[in-house]
């Protein structure tokens, strides 16, 4: 049923383009990549940005069944036996709690979607879809949703900060009113607000804070945790790199204690699960970080490689990593970003990233203008400062086509995602470990 519902929503263009949860071709990484890219482009113009992260209290447990069914009927066109099926699915559910050998009496569930179900999360996104319409009514604000995580961000300049903050406050007031009407509750204690920009910009804007949001005073945080990724106030990703290093080395210590008990193949599998997954989580957002930060991340992979291969503490790991078929961390970042680019170009998913990419076109006949070569257009930087140029280069609109155009033709023209990943890894492997 979940598959049929998703197909129906897509075929009838009823999918919320700003919601990235529970949708094919979408992920936390694609959502964060879009948000981070938009903010980088704002900073590249010499502006600063404000990002507000909204938190809902027990969001999946407070959905009103009657309101949800009404929304499915009026806004999504479900009727007849289909609507009756959803009514039967949601209503007359009962729940009890068992502690040791004691079972409580049953109570009927009047609110919430079934926990652990496939349909529950999809129904939640449909229930909260009107949030996008409310936020979109404020033209100076941008937003993105991932399940119950709502993010609102906007440009700030010294000339427009007062009006921009007023728009944000009005928007949040409208969001809060809608949530109250729909049995949802914002959690002000976990709502976070951060201003992103240079230290000089933040000093100039300091007089405008704290601001009043939903009756609470908010001063900008120095960092926020955004769907598992740390955004610091300069968007340097240094805080996130530190978090990744701390988490990875914690698991490496545990791994080193049991390595002697494991075969090499099991050790590699466990290392990838415990440490590799943390290195690779949303790692496309690492594009553009400093060489020093990449060295810190590479040290994790090197240490892990030495433990697996029983190498001395200071031994070189280049040959061992080559035998393990491990790309260096910096190349893994490029690999992930290029795979996302390939999917955006060839599947048009997610649409908000696909819209950032344009094929190269030129009136003159050149090698790049040949559509068979699949080159992408790279926007030209028109501002002056070096610091702003860094942000420009870090945006998806610039980083993706720059990396894409550097690939050999046989990689760019791969017929499938599987083929592209294979050819891309071979190409990057040859660059990382030249013969």
Model regions: which residues?
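Hydrophobic/basic alpha-helical segments
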Residues: 3-435
